[in-house]
């Protein structure tokens, strides 16, 4: 005689689904903080790289001025970059925090400030309108009475650290 095969369900049991959800939750709890840490590290590296590019632009500007017999004066180093970064918003003077949103650079002619509004949290920096900015100031390098170079420095009053 012919026997009929029993009809069995091939789905997941409730216990199996709960175990999968718990495992996914644990993986998410581990992965999400690491993802934020990686994005903060990437932002720190990007800021350091941009500062190095701007310092190089200032050095090239100084060299050109000497070669042309022109005086060296503080100016916006973003103007000297061959490829201005897409996150540079231009001159922001007087400072309006809404003109330099998170992750953007701007230049303040008053004081020769290069300003960056970080996405990641920082302690210290310069505060305006509830926003914290990282400030680099263009300073003259002098020999006697001659300006022989320009450099970017942080001002002790606006020191910062990444959280």
State where each predicted segment sits.
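Alpha-helix N-cap/helix-initiation motif
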Residues: 7, 16, 40-44
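Membrane-proximal N-terminal amphipathic helix
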Residues: 40-69
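N-terminal leader/signal peptides at the extreme start of proteins
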Residues: 1-10
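Short, surface-exposed interaction loops/tails
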Residues: 113-163
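Phosphate-coordinating loops and pocket residues in cytosolic domains that bind phosphorylated ligands
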Residues: 37
